[in-house]
A protein has these predicted regions:
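Intracellular, membrane-proximal regulatory regions of polytopic membrane proteins
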Residues: 555-628
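Short, charged amphipathic alpha-helical "coupling" segments at sensory-output junctions
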Residues: 632-635
Length: 635
């Protein structure tokens, strides 16, 4: 059996192992035997989804090219979990009390359950994650090619582009099977979390094993390794203070705004107290992941031939010394890093697309007289999530093809970080400032996103691909102040720092300025009070009044989304809560609040609010709720 066939078998076997682990975890949770799944250490290991193929392969290449600058990628998350864990706790509490399913759902819920804002946040998340998906495809494709050599060019793979296509297809198939079995996105995915925890251990063990081999097997011990580091060009790199600060900020922002991080950190959180454990255990994990980066980079530069790709030193160093077993472990570690990121990111993005794009379109068709069979709604949501997963992987593959797949892994990752960070002002502002408005959030996010697109994403394809060489040199439309990498005539800056500075500063300034000029709607004010004072009002949501709904109508609507058994169980429990016989409660405001929160786990807060409002016929915020907001504002 050729080495390429061995790699295929190993990958399939590893995926099968993940399926078994996930299946056993789901069965244990279904039987109520999931106390070990709720361990704070399992939660901490799930946060390792931050460490993708970029940190497994690309950190070494980053160190070889830029010295200690690679540490900024670990420093940002460390500062967040150590210094800002109280903010993470608030974020988790908001997610639980509002039944938030994604970053877009959080933004939508905070700003008056605006689906327009949710749609835009979803587009930002999808487009911002696309380079990151391409990064995973590139890393897996490069590792296949390096390991298998000439065998990787045989049909049906042909070349790296064809190989990337098959990798994308396989990851899409795996993710669809893995992550779309449950409709309620707010339910805990015990199987997925357990599989991520296993992958966290695998990639850490693989990287440490390679590091030990490099230090004691190739460099001659710790003292000899330190001497090599001192003599290496890596020690001569002098990082720019501006770039160092910018990258640290970017990695911290990405830790909060990456869709996959929000999924595991907020949606999958079982207990807020787990954040205390994560505040020291996760930085320890990051330290171990970064411990051997410089030694591997230094020894790789010394032993590997000139022109060798430093992004692959973790794999090619063992191969060059005939250590196929260690190289296979390294390959599995890199494959594990890529698959875990793709699975969780695709799950999170597909939830956003189905909740904030597909379901609103369905509601619009229904309102305009379209015919939709009641029993098809669950199928529509699940199908849309599966198609979205395939679409996300297709976008990643398209970016890989257009960009040529030749950029350094770290460069691709930083482009993605900068795009997803545009959500940060609206997110943090909404958590701590009642005066933040939907208009402010939309204005800031739109300006920041388009500046990132113009200054960083489109130029990443190269001159003449998307933006013409004339645009690079003379500016858009011949306007010199609209050059992508010298905006407003500012020249001489690092392109990444330039794009981040303009996009984030104008995003934040416009968010604040427009919020000060506009007035929030009553629902925005109510949601703002719930978010800012979440620890005082964790259980409350917006009120309902003025409705004319019948319980039967609400039951029919709930069955379309939740399914018959779950909807009947929920309605019966609510009827019992009201002291009524049977399974139809009175449509009082408290019941409608809980029904909306229940539905939001499946279709998102904005769509759930719209569906209940549509069924009610007319819905407004109650006077009592407005008085409560006024009282809180006065305090």
């Amino acid at each position: 059996m050729g080495i390429f066939n061995v790699l295929i078998v190993v990958c399939l076997g590893y995926v099968a192992l993940l399926f078994i682990v996930a299946f056993m975890a789901e069965r244990a949770a279904a039987r109520g035997q999931s106390s070990w799944l709720r361990s704070p250490f399992i939660y901490t290991l799930s946060l390792s989804i931050y460490c993708t193929a970029w940190t497994f392969y690309g950190a070494v290449g980053y160190a070889a090219r830029s010295g200690l600058e690679y540490l900024t990628i670990y420093l940002g998350p460390t500062l967040v979990v150590v210094g800002w864990w109280w903010m993470l706790r608030k974020l988790v509490r908001i997610g639980r009390s509002q039944r938030i399913t994604s970053v877009a759902d959080l933004i939508s819920s905070r700003y008056g359950k605006s689906n327009t804002l949710a749609v835009f946040a979803t587009l930002v998340a999808v487009i911002g994650t696309t380079p990151y998906i391409a990064l995973q495809l590139q890393s897996v494709t490069l590792s296949f090619s390096s390991f298998a050599g000439v065998e990787a060019t045989v049909p049906p793979f042909g070349d790296r582009n064809a190989m990337a296509f098959w990798v994308a297809g396989g990851l899409a198939f795996f993710t669809i099977l893995f992550g779309t079995r449950n409709l309620d996105a707010n339910e805990r995915h015990h199987g997925v979390v357990m599989a991520i925890a296993l992958e966290a251990v695998v990639k850490l063990v693989a990287l440490i094993a390679v590091g030990i081999f490099v230090i004691w097997g190739l460099a001659g011990g710790i003292e000899a390794t330190l001497a090599k580091i001192d003599a290496s060009p890596i020690g001569t790199f002098t990082p720019s203070a501006g770039r160092w600060a910018g990258l640290t900020f970017l990695s911290a922002a990405a830790f909060l705004t990456l869709p996959r991080m929000f999924q595991v950190m907020v949606v999958e959180n079982e207990d807020e107290r787990h954040l205390r454990t994560a505040s020291w255990a996760f930085p320890t994990y990051l330290m171990l992941m970064s411990l051997f980066v410089v030694p591997i980079a230094v020894v790789g530069l010394e032993l590997m031939p000139a022109g060798a790709n430093p992004d692959l030193f973790v794999l090619t160093l063992p191969l060059s010394q005939g250590r196929e077993g260690l190289a296979m472990l390294s390959f599995i570690g890199g494959f594990s890093s890529a698959t875990s990121m793709v699975i969780v990111a695709a799950i999170a993005l597909s939830t956003m697309v189905s909740n904030h794009i597909v379901m609103p379109i369905w509601l619009w068709l229904k309102e305009d007289g379209g015919t939709v069979v009641s029993g098809d709604v669950r199928g529509i949501v699940l199908l849309s999530r599966r198609v979205s997963i395939a679409g996300v992987l297709a976008l990643g593959y398209l970016y890989y093809r257009i960009s040529g797949g030749g950029a350094a892994l770290a460069a691709i990752g930083l482009i993605s970080f900068a795009g997803l960070a545009q959500v940060l002002p609206a997110m943090v502002g909404g958590m701590f400032w009642r005066g933040a408005t939907r208009a402010g959030a939309m204005s800031g996010l739109a300006v920041g996103f388009f500046l990132w697109l113009f200054c960083l994403l489109l130029p990443s394809f190269g001159e003449g691909v998307v933006l013409s060489a004339e645009t690079f040199q003379n500016g858009l439309g011949g306007l010199a102040w609209l050059r992508p990498q010298a905006l407003f005539g500012i020249t001489g800056m690092d392109p990444l720092v330039h794009a981040v500075m303009w996009s984030m500063s104008l995003n934040t300034l416009l968010f604040i300025f427009v919020s000060l000029l506009t007035f929030p709607s009553p629902l925005e004010r109510l949601q703002g009070a719930q978010f800012v004072n979440v620890f005082q009002h964790s259980g409350a949501t917006q009120g309902w009044s003025g409705g004319v709904a019948q319980s039967e109508d609400l039951m029919v609507m709930a069955q379309r989304i939740l399914g018959g058994p779950e909807a009947q169980s929920f309605f019966q429990a609510e009827a019992t809560r009201q002291g009524l016989a049977g399974f139809l409660p009175e449509p009082i405001p408290d019941f409608l609040q809980r029904l909306e929160r229940k539905l939001s786990g499946s279709v998102g807060s904005a769509t759930a609010h719209a569906m209940v409002a549509q069924t009610m016929g007319r819905a407004t915020v109650s006077v009592d709720d407005l008085l409560r907001v006024a009282d809180e504002t006065a305090q």
